[in-house]
């Protein structure tokens, strides 16, 4: 089992579901440099022509990713927008940008569940440019029940072969 799977299994033992799980997951992901650099390598393989796209990052995860990989991200993408966090728990997205250099956006985030964060951000981006869209969302953890179109994840909770569940041995 890889390191990411082990760490997620450990969190699931303590927090099997809900906001406590996502809070613990978020804290673990943004504090692990190895997982963040693995994520960037994973994401690079999922994005076609990043130099023509705007990268959307959110909250503490976005800040952590920029701190570790910012130079590389600035070289890869036409533009980068960092949006406030807390959208999953009800905060409205705040975008400090008046012009999108490209309306074709890609979103990197730590986790995905229902798509609420992505959809709220896309609505705000459309206020800046009516043709704005988030074509692909690349995440570390995908907890959505059904596979979502245009969501790529390193770890999918509801996968057909959940090998990581072997580590959920409760003592």
Where on the chain are the PLM-derived regions?
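Short glycine-rich phosphate-binding loop at a beta-alpha junction
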Residues: 51-61
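Structural motif
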Residues: 54, 104-106, 136
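Conserved beta-strand scaffold positions in the cores of enzyme catalytic domains, especially
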Residues: 55, 77-84, 137, 151
């Amino acid at each position: 089992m890889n390191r990411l799977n082990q760490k997620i299994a450990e969190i699931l033992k303590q927090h099997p579901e809900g906001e406590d799980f996502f809070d613990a997951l978020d804290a673990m992901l943004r504090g692990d440099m190895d997982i963040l650099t693995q994520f960037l390598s994973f994401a690079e393989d999922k994005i076609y022509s990043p130099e023509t796209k705007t990268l959307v990052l959110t909250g503490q995860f976005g800040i952590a990713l920029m701190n570790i990989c910012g130079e590389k991200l600035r070289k890869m993408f036409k533009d980068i927008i960092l949006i406030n966090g807390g959208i999953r728990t009800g905060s409205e997205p705040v975008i400090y940008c008046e012009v999108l250099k490209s309306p074709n956006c890609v979103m990197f985030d730590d986790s995905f569940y229902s798509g609420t964060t992505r959809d709220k951000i896309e609505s705000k981006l459309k206020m800046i440019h009516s043709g704005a869209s988030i074509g692909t969302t690349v995440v570390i953890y995908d907890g959505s029940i059904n596979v979502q179109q245009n969501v790529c994840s390193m770890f999918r909770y509801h996968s057909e072969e959940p090998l990581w569940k072997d580590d959920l041995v409760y003592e």
